[in-house]
């Protein structure tokens, strides 16, 4: 067993105890009862919804280039030769391997060749699924859904169990809370006999400025998940993919608790809108390049989530301190009247987010 502590978090590896998870991360945070996932409005998001999967992102695909970066790994001393043999043994003969080890374990190089290949290798066999422990946040809707996408809500325990049942418990790690820190401190590889803790550490630390996300993560581990080198700046290596679906993590479709559409989703750039009454609106997607995803989305909701639909809203909220503007969501009813035509009905059941 190895142990690492940083910023109030404890990272523990259990390589020799098969009765325990390979890695345990204790952030002294209570797991939320519900977690949410925000989606922008595009074909990939709709496919993920209707096929009940999350895309487990490669670090190159994250919106913070410091997130899970190889720069979060460093050394203050030489690494054991066994690490080089395990990583480079099939690529170099013994003489070249010894030469690489000697050069790489200098103060100037600081094991950069090892760190680079180690990171590239593990990034091909893991992916990150980011969720939020907050049902509402004034920044999450514009940042991740552009106020036009949608949000899914899950019971945390149901989601964890569902993903583990679908892809195998040994391929799922987490749910872990993110360790938000004032500074990004790289972890010293030379302090560890195995590199499980350094790997999970680099996937778990973010600057405190991101703490508004209240992020919780699954780490998915599979073979040949792929490395999208083309998404890395100035990188000339070709993308490596066997099957993009290796980055999909499926869940049971019936565990979605709610779907909330963004406040700006329904507008006249997307729909012909007929206000039948204050409560009832008829929607017809406008034929254009985007209309197909709107049809697929509303068909799916009306067939599978019609009793779980909400719409993001805004109201004036009166209190002893005066009037303020707050976000809300209102439960809606949806019926598919005919092909490409939908009836949306307000229920006036409004949830406030102060």
Whereabouts are the PLM-identified features?
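Partner-binding and oligomerization surfaces adjacent to conserved cores of proteins
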Residues: 1-354
């Amino acid at each position: 067993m190895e142990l690492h502590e940083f910023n109030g978090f404890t990272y523990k590896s259990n390589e020799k105890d098969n009765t325990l998870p390979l890695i345990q991360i204790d952030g002294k945070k209570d797991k939320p009862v519900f977690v949410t996932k925000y989606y922008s409005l595009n074909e990939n998001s709709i496919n993920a919804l209707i096929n009940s999967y999350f895309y487990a992102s490669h670090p190159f695909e994250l919106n913070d280039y410091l997130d899970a970066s190889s720069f979060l790994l460093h050394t203050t001393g030489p690494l054991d030769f066994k690490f080089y043999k395990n990583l480079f043994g099939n690529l170099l003969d013994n003489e070249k391997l010894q030469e690489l080890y000697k050069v790489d374990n200098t103060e100037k190089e600081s094991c950069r060749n090892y760190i680079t290949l180690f990171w590239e290798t593990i990034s091909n066999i893991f992916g990150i699924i980011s969720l939020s422990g907050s049902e509402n946040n004034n920044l999450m809707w514009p940042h991740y859904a552009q106020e036009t996408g949608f949000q899914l809500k899950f019971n945390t325990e149901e989601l964890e169990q569902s993903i583990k049942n679908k892809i195998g418990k040994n391929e799922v790690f987490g749910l872990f809370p993110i360790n938000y820190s004032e500074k990004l401190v790289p972890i010293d590889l030379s302090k560890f006999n195995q590199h499980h803790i350094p790997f999970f550490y680099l996937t778990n630390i973010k600057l405190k400025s991101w703490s508004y996300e209240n992020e919780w993560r699954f780490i998915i581990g599979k073979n040949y998940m792929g490395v999208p080198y083309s998404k890395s700046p100035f990188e000339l290596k070709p993308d490596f993919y066997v099957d993009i679906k290796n980055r999909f993590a499926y869940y049971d479709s019936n565990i979605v608790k709610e779907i909330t559409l963004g406040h700006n989703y329904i507008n006249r750039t997307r729909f012909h809108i007929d206000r039948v009454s204050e409560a009832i609106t008829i929607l017809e997607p406008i034929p254009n390049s985007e209309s197909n995803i709107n049809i697929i989305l509303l068909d799916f909701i009306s067939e599978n989530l019609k009793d779980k639909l909400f719409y993001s809203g805004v109201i004036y909220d009166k209190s002893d301190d005066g009037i303020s503007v707050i976000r809300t969501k209102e439960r809606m009813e949806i019926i598919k009247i005919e092909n490409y035509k939908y009836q949306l009905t307000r229920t006036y059941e409004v949830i406030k987010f102060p």
